[in-house]
UniProtKB/Swiss-Prot annotation:
Protein name listed in UniProt: Centromere protein R
Organism: Homo sapiens
Effect of residue 28 to A: Loss of repressor function
Motif interval(s): Nuclear localization signal: 63-66
Gene name of the encoded protein: ITGB3BP
Crosslink (Glycyl lysine isopeptide (Lys-Gly) (interchain with G-Cter in SUMO2)) position: 8, 22
One example of a Gene Ontology biological process annotation: cell adhesion
Length: 177
């Protein structure tokens, strides 16, 4: 037997069913990030005006200015000042490291009184003192190497890169002259 099917759409169609208030529209694609697919939370999160975009991408848009700043000419003076400041900070760290070692010893004695390893696991008392001493020694060695290299460059008049490419004869000749 044939089955008769009919769609009763007359009740569903109304005259105002196509009003803009009833049609749900998708959000603008512009508000979504192409990399993450997430919606932008704030309108002020990234610059939207072209002037702000120019300032933000100035270097990448090949609008580079020549770098004749006075700060670049003073870079040699600032490196010596930075080196001196670094050495002063290093000496402060050495002094403070001794205090830290004393505090760690006190904590380890407290740990011995407690009889548990929870304090050691929490703070890491057992190996921290060795690491601190080792790092301080490495930093000192590196700073002395840097200072020796700078003194060598000043005495020979050769830049560091040029001294790398010399063979032993040219190196000795440069030192003697």
């Amino acid at each position: 037997m044939p089955v008769k099917r009919s769609l009763k759409l007359d009740g569903l169609l109304e005259e105002n069913s196509f009003d803009p208030s009833k049609i749900t529209r998708k959000k603008s694609v512009i508000t979504y990030s192409p990399t993450t697919g997430t919606c932008q939370m704030s309108l002020f999160a990234s610059p939207t005006s072209s002037e702000e975009q120019k300032h933000r991408n100035g270097l990448s848009n090949e609008k580079r200015k020549k770098l004749n700043h006075p700060s670049l000419t003073e870079s040699k003076e600032s490196t010596t000042k930075d080196n001196d400041e670094f050495m002063m900070l290093l000496s402060k760290v050495e002094k403070l490291s001794e205090e830290i070692m004393e505090i760690m010893q006190n904590l380890s004695s407290i740990q011995a009184l407690e009889g548990s390893r929870e304090l050691e696991n929490l703070i890491g008392i057992s190996c921290a003192s060795h690491f601190l001493k080792r790092e301080m020694q490495k930093t000192k060695e590196l700073m002395t190497k840097v200072n020796k290299q700078k003194l060598f460059e000043k005495s020979t008049g050769l830049p560091h890169k040029a001294s790398r490419h010399l063979d032993s004869y040219e190196f000795l000749k440069a030192i003697l002259n």
